[in-house]
Design a protein with these regions (language model features):
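Post-HExxH zinc-binding segment in Zn-dependent metallohydrolases
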Residues: 104-149
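Surface-exposed patches in mature extracellular/periplasmic domains of secreted proteins
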Residues: 43-53, 97-103, 121-131, 195-199
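Auxiliary, metal-adjacent structural segments of Zn-dependent hydrolase domains
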Residues: 5-76
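Pan-zinc metallopeptidase signature
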Residues: 1, 151-235
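Active-site His/Glu-centered metal-binding helix of metallohydrolases
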Residues: 85-97, 109, 113
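Short pre-active-site segment immediately N-terminal to the catalytic Zn-binding motif
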Residues: 68-85, 96-105
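Hydrophobic (often cysteine-bearing) scaffold residues that line and stabilize catalytic clefts
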Residues: 26-29, 82, 106, 175
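Second-shell loop/turn segments in exported
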Residues: 16-26, 96-101, 169-170
Length: 235
């Protein structure tokens, strides 16, 4: 096994059975996604990170305590890796546990992250001449995202019953994708909203959704507050 340092992020590593030469494109994808997160959703605290490829029922997942992210993919599947890594890195950059009644919102936002960052990644790679293979591959990140979003189940976000259903089971993936599909245009037009996401875990657990949005708006950077109000109107 190899512990491969990401070239642009010295504190981040890929634990892989492949050497750096064979994992080059994979490393570039991880590196670029972290750089995009640094731009839009900066970490509240700089932490090391080890990414491992783990085929198991619990993967993909992140472990904040041990600074690890597991991806359930193979080194050649860079679109799948980008999709999973963006989702898990979104979780990883929320430093505190999110209240159980808001975990569905966290899951839906992290699903949104997959699609937002894959599309930004496609643009970055399409203009980079030093990674020819990934430059040619770049449009596939967008098509992968589009295909995933099609696999969703419609959710009425103004229905208290449907919100309650997601509160009780926040891993309803088809519903998460539906919510993500409705959040994505807002994040694309108001990317400053990503700066508020790390503060989701600061919202106390005893509040309902309207009050939680109010608290989230107060504790987030001032530049995000209008965008949070716009998100609340979706629900």
């Amino acid at each position: 096994m190899y512990l491969l340092r990401l070239p642009e992020h010295p504190g981040c590593y890929l634990y892989s059975e492949h050497n750096a030469r064979n994992a080059d494109n994979f490393l570039v994808v991880l590196d670029e996604i972290i750089s995009l997160f640094d731009m839009y959703m900066p970490a509240r605290e700089e932490l090391p990170l080890r990414v491992s490829l783990v085929r198991s029922e619990e993967s993909p997942c992140c472990f904040r305590g041990s600074h690890e992210i597991y991806l359930n993919t193979e080194i050649q599947y860079v679109s799948q890796a980008a999709y999973q890594f963006s989702h898990e890195l979104c979780h990883y950059r929320i430093p505190y546990l999110v209240a159980e009644n808001l975990k569905w919102l966290e899951e839906s936002i992290c699903e949104t992250a997959s699609h937002f960052y894959m599309r930004r990644l496609a643009h970055i790679l399409s203009v980079k001449s030093n990674h020819t293979a990934l430059k040619e591959y770049a449009p596939r990140f967008v098509s992968y995202s589009e295909n995933v979003l099609k696999d969703c189940r419609k959710v009425d976000l103004h229905s208290p019953l449907q919100i309650r259903r997601m509160e009780l089971n926040w891993y309803l993936r088809e519903e998460n994708r539906c919510v993500a599909g409705q959040l994505l245009p807002l994040f694309e037009t108001r990317p400053v909203l990503w700066q508020a996401v790390p503060f989701l875990g600061d919202i106390p657990p005893e509040f309902g959704l309207p009050d939680s949005f109010m608290i989230w708006k107060k504790i987030s950077p001032a530049v995000c507050r209008q965008a949070i109000e716009e998100m609340q109107s979706i629900f």
